[in-house]
Amino acid sequence: MPERGRASAGSKAADVGGVGAVDAAAVEAADVEVGVADVLAAQARLRSYLPITPMHHAERFGVMLKLENLQRTGSYKVRGALNAMLAARERGDSRPVICASAGNHAQGVAWAAYRLGVPAITVMPHGAPENKIAGVAHWGATVRQHGDSYD
């Protein structure tokens, strides 16, 4: 196991401003199946935190649109972030959270952390849109800029 803040040889991991390293190969090797019970559990967790967003029939295209842009963060990405943090809380895990994102996921993590009173760090690449950085900072998350891309 690599030391905290150091990448093991050959891994795609990085020390990000002293917050530690994540081994990308280990993350990719995690095989997770999501079933109906998982979806229903997530729905139950999120019910009291997020509004039900409306559906809109776009007749011209023959599709239904779920208006997740009406979430506080402007994106559906808050759902996954909040669900993960609530599930961690159910397991008794109240550690700070960290994510890597250039925008919507980072804002979702920041809002969820704010709502749950959990410290959050978002790692965003240099060149991330200023409005996304400001959105993350607005919810109180620490923004660390690292690298020039998502890789």
Features from the language model and the residues they span:
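PLP-dependent amino-acid enzyme catalytic core
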Residues: 1-151
